[in-house]
Amino acid sequence: MSKRDFYDVLGVSRNASADELKKAYRSLAKKYHPDQNQGDKEAEQRFKELNEAYDALKDEQSRAAYDQFGHAAFDGGMGARGGPGGMGGFGAGASMSDIFDDLFGEFMGGRGGRGGRRGDGGQTRGHDLRYNMEISLEEAFEGKKAQVRVPGSVACEVCTGTGAAPGSSPITCPTCQGHGKVRASQGFFTIERTCPTCHGRGQTIDKPCTNCHGAGRVEKERTLSVNIPAGVEDGTRIRLSGEGEAGMRGGPAGDLYIFLSVKPHRLFERDGADLFCRVPIAMVTATLGGEIEVPTLGGKKVKVKVPEGAQTGRQFRLRGKGMPVVNSRETGDLYIQITVETPVNLTKKQKELLKEFEQASTPGNNPESAGFFAKVKEFWDGFQN
């Protein structure tokens, strides 16, 4: 049966960019990956076809050969001997780790070996996982021990992560002799590609584990305990080493990253380790002075003395009443900002008393307003002159 055009297989035009090729491949590979379509022979064949097409087109040199010679550039009477200098067919295999490698790596500022990396013997490090957790400001203040349910893969208990059935073990790939790569020559072209037999692992499994189907891992939801230290801020990232996705065929597990989001509070605002609270006070208290009770995030009430003549916006600093600093004995401060409340719903008598107060008042009782209106008068006088 004749092979389909590689560009048609990936659903892209012949002038598609490398990024467009990768995007198309990843999208289709996720759809047809054997792990997602177990027992579906058509999906398995489609997946192999996708790998072969992308493997040929992702490299500039092999893509140029394909554009010039078509499929003959790769199967023009060439055998399948592996290893450097040998000749072999082309094709590649992609695990789900390969497909999702970029997706899980990007959230930490780049790939940087964060998963999907193959080691000796075909071992592949598991992906790092991300878990978003929302906590209250009180929980950030006190710290807490939380339970998180993490979906993902864990090492297969039957084969202990090797992928091979009990009593057997992986063997050196006969095609590439354990190199994971094969070379093919066509005229002046010599192109090294991933081994089509072991998919770059250097090993094959004759007797796959029936529990994990040779993957070395199975899907399972886990419940983990996470210690959240007191003083964490919004956006804090907590790393749980080795609690990410299980590796392939005995490879190391990835890490789990807990990203914390602190919910807004109804009374307090936060700036680093400092807390801010706006407290309304009565006009009489602001005028004559007095004592008010203010809340703290720890649940205790603190008394604050308000001096005579206090104005809206006046701040009072309560040292050590703010947020704790993570991994430190230091503590931030609590700032109380008062707002003078104008009385409403006055009785007739209250209004009469205020009118008497107004009549008895002098400009010195309201220096800011008196000074402001004096400046306004000077401003207007300047226009008249």
From Swiss-Prot:
| Keywords (A to Z) from UniProt | Chaperone, Cytoplasm, DNA replication, Metal-binding, Repeat, Stress response, Zinc, Zinc-finger
**What does the entry comment about cofactor binding?**
Binds 2 Zn(2+) ions per monomer.
Q: Which cysteines are joined by disulfide bonds?
A: none
Cell compartments where the protein resides: Cytoplasm
For biological process, the GO terms are: chaperone cofactor-dependent protein refolding; DNA replication; protein refolding; response to heat
Q: Where is the J domain?
A: 5-70
Provide a Gene Ontology MF annotation, just one. zinc ion binding
Give start and end residues of every CXXCXGXG motif repeat.
Answer: 156-163, 173-180, 195-202, 209-216
Zinc fingers classed as CR-type: ranges: 143-221
Which InterPro entries does the annotation name?
DnaJ (IPR012724), DnaJ_C (IPR002939), DnaJ_domain (IPR001623), DnaJ_domain_CS (IPR018253), HSP40/DnaJ_pept-bd (IPR008971), HSP_DnaJ_Cys-rich_dom (IPR001305), HSP_DnaJ_Cys-rich_dom_sf (IPR036410), J_dom_sf (IPR036869)
GO CC terms in record: cytoplasm
**Pfam families xref list:** DnaJ, DnaJ_C, DnaJ_CXXCXGXG
> What does this protein need as cofactor?
Zn(2+)
- Role according to the record: Participates actively in the response to hyperosmotic and heat shock by preventing the aggregation of stress-denatured proteins and by disaggregating proteins, also in an autonomous, DnaK-independent fashion. Unfolded proteins bind initially to DnaJ; upon interaction with the DnaJ-bound protein, DnaK hydrolyzes its bound ATP, resulting in the formation of a stable complex. GrpE releases ADP from DnaK; ATP binding to DnaK triggers the release of the substrate protein, thus completing the reaction cycle.
- List the protein's name: Chaperone protein DnaJ
